Design a protein with these regions (language model features):
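Bulky hydrophobic segments
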Residues: 2-123, 139-193
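Individual transmembrane alpha-helices with interfacial aromatic-anchor signatures
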Residues: 125-132
């Protein structure tokens, strides 16, 4: 291994260190915002399969984790188009940073109240563990979209949206729409009426 390879190897560690620092920073910020580390129920689950339960957003993964995979897809596409000269690892860091910023915003009192007004009456915000799980799923989605390429990841995006609509009566697109502009018939459909 020559000097050039050694320098390149050392440079390639910086995006990974940046990711770790981002995760540490978002953890401290969420803690500062009053988020609990774990569910107040005193239990810890890797997976909660119910979309509308008191355990949703309180454990590592839940059905909404799939929407965070889709965040990763979208970030991969956008950063690939707008920052093609950046290495994929730096684009991954940008995606994880954007997702971390979203987790901080999503767990602000304003957005929690907005979700509650849009029909998520029992929603009190994510635990720190759930937010970190969401960020990890976004990173997974980014890497998966990079591996699959645009066309196949777009097909998977659409398929996941459809599956989520039938499974939990929600999806990334629907979540964004109802957060910005709640529509009564969508809220009624989501509630099962």
């Amino acid at each position: 291994m020559g000097l050039d390879a050694s320098v390149a190897d050392k440079r390639s560690i910086w995006p990974w260190l940046a990711i770790v620092l981002t995760l540490v920073a978002v953890t401290f910020q969420l803690y500062y915002q009053g988020r609990l580390w774990l569910c107040s129920c005193g239990q810890f689950f890797l997976w909660v399969g119910e979309a509308r339960s008191s355990n949703t957003s309180q454990h590592l993964l839940d059905p909404y984790s799939f929407t965070h995979v889709l965040h990763g897809f979208v970030f991969c596409w956008l950063l690939g188009w707008f920052a093609p000269r950046l290495s994929w690892t730096w684009r991954l860091w940008l995606a994880i940073t954007a997702e971390a910023v979203w987790e901080v915003i999503e767990n602000s009192n304003f957005v929690i109240q907005r979700y509650r007004e849009a029909g998520a009456l029992g929603y009190f915000g994510d635990t720190i563990v759930n937010s970190l799980g969401d960020i990890a799923m976004c990173g997974f989605g980014f890497v998966l979209a990079r591996y699959l390429g645009f066309v196949r990841s777009l097909a998977l995006f659409v398929a996941l949206e459809v599956v989520l609509l039938f499974w939990i009566r929600d999806s990334l697109v629907l979540n964004v729409v109802t957060l910005i502009y709640p529509i009564e018939w969508i809220e009624q459909w989501q509630a099962g009426y």
